[in-house]
Amino acid sequence: QHETNHETELITLRRARKYRRSHFSFSFVRNPFDRLIAAYNNKVIENEEPPQPMQNMGVTHGMSFEDFLDVLIETPYKQYDVHVLPQSQLLCIGNQIVPKFVGRVEQINEHWAELRDILARQGVEVMESLPQKNVRRRDRGGLQDYFNSDALIEKTLQIYGDDVRLFYNDVSVDHL
């Protein structure tokens, strides 16, 4: 069970799978490269002290991005802080995606409209559009500063390869 800062209840995947027949579940995933950079910048660079779960992993304030990746590679997923845990670990049992609908943050308006249509057919009304929160990067420029070698891309794929394969299989890694 991973912490969500007491903002939401994060149920286990097995419990979610039990609800799958009687409930409609959905999730939005984020480009794993963007998500990784956001976690690194916020938790390692901006915060004076990384969250305790990250400290337990060996993450320290101001460590280099490559050292951060090495810590992630060396740490078993069960010890990950939720901010860096691969989304496939949160949303899948094996390679089975538990939510019935998975949209992408990068296409949130389009995918939200699609989800709204699905929910409307089931008699569920939801807001017309979603509020913009925690928007940090609107262009692709910021990623190249971090992923400036094939080795760093490979290390990232070693951790988040399942996320790319399951949720971004129609997008070239060069375009993530």
Model-derived regions: residue spans:
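Membrane-interface amphipathic segments in extracytoplasmic regions
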Residues: 1-176
